């Protein structure tokens, strides 16, 4: 676990031994601060001083920042989903900016569709606000299809939709935040990019929302592979069971108790099982077409060695 504690003349900070989340130290002329994300202190006049290594322990005093334990860079296993979804756009983790990664990720998805003959004939590429937007911009830039915003996010009073503990409230928050631009929806063929497909309930409502507003076709691209496991390290997910995940529900229905043996095949949409999973999710969400970013594509977009990244929610590897 990450740790903060007071110790006499200073505060002591420790980054978790595998560095699953960052700890960033900021500095200005009159002192230091510590945050999960650098943008949190930039408006206060601090600049990034350092990122703690996995397991590193520092003490901040009136005299400066002292390293009490060096940590071990070789144990790095930072959460990949920080770039795909959770991170703020201008946050920088291990030298990689979130917005840059997302744009590059969209470009890779478009390249894959072009290479595999799956680039659809649509009027616009669009992103599910907020985190889906830069993925979509990258896809639009690489594919040559115009980018548009057929619905706008209304943010006052509404939190991020994954935060409420109740699924009904999560759906309500997601629905209330989106306001349609009818001219960009009615009679149009649209390709949307979202950061992920977890349970599928909010996605289903978004697709229905688009059809109700006159969309002719709704294609979807997921900016990461199918979610196969709930996160057991950072407590990000509100899921109480992996059977809440739409991918696991479909696998369980198809394979029963043996389904866990075939997770790797289902995770890869190039395999027969992977294609069946993709097609069934596509059918349930009433999409015209659906493709997932591959794990390899996600890692390429981040630009770090896979051995330094936690990909547990996709492949179950610890």
Can you say where each PLM-predicted feature lies in the sequence?
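Short glycine-rich phosphate-binding loop at a beta-alpha junction
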Residues: 118-131, 219, 290-293
């Amino acid at each position: 676990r990450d740790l903060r504690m007071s110790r006499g003349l200073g505060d002591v900070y420790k980054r978790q031994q595998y560095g699953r989340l960052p700890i960033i130290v900021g500095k200005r002329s009159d002192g230091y601060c510590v945050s999960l994300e650098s943008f949190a202190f930039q408006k206060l006049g601090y600049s990034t001083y350092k990122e703690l290594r996995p397991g590193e322990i520092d003490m901040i005093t009136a005299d400066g920042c002292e390293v009490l334990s060096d940590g071990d860079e070789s144990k790095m296993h930072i959460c990949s989903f920080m770039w795909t979804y959770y991170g703020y756009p201008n946050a920088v983790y291990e030298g990689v900016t979130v917005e840059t990664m997302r744009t590059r990720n969209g470009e890779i998805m478009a390249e894959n569709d072009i290479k595999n003959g799956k680039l659809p004939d649509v009027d616009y590429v669009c992103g599910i606000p907020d985190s889906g937007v830069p993925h979509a911009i990258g896809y639009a830039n690489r594919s040559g299809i115009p980018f548009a915003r057929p619905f706008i996010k209304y943010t006052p009073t509404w939190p991020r939709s994954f935060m409420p503990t109740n699924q009904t409230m999560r759906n309500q928050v997601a629905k209330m935040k989106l306001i349609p631009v009818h001219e960009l929806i009615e009679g149009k063929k649209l390709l949307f990019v979202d950061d992920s497909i977890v349970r599928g309930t909010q996605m289903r409502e978004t697709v229905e929302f688009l059809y109700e507003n006159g969309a002719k076709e709704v294609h979807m691209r997921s900016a990461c592979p199918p979610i196969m496991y709930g996160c057991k390290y950072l407590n990000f997910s509100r899921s109480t069971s992996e059977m809440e995940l739409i991918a696991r529900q479909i696998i369980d229905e198809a394979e029963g108790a043996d389904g866990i043996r075939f997770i790797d095949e289902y995770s890869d949409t190039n395999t027969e099982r992977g294609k069946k999973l993709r097609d069934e999710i596509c059918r349930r969400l009433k999409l015209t077409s659906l493709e997932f970013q591959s794990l390899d594509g996600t890692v390429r977009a981040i630009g770090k060695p896979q051995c330094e990244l936690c990909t547990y929610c996709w492949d179950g590897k610890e």
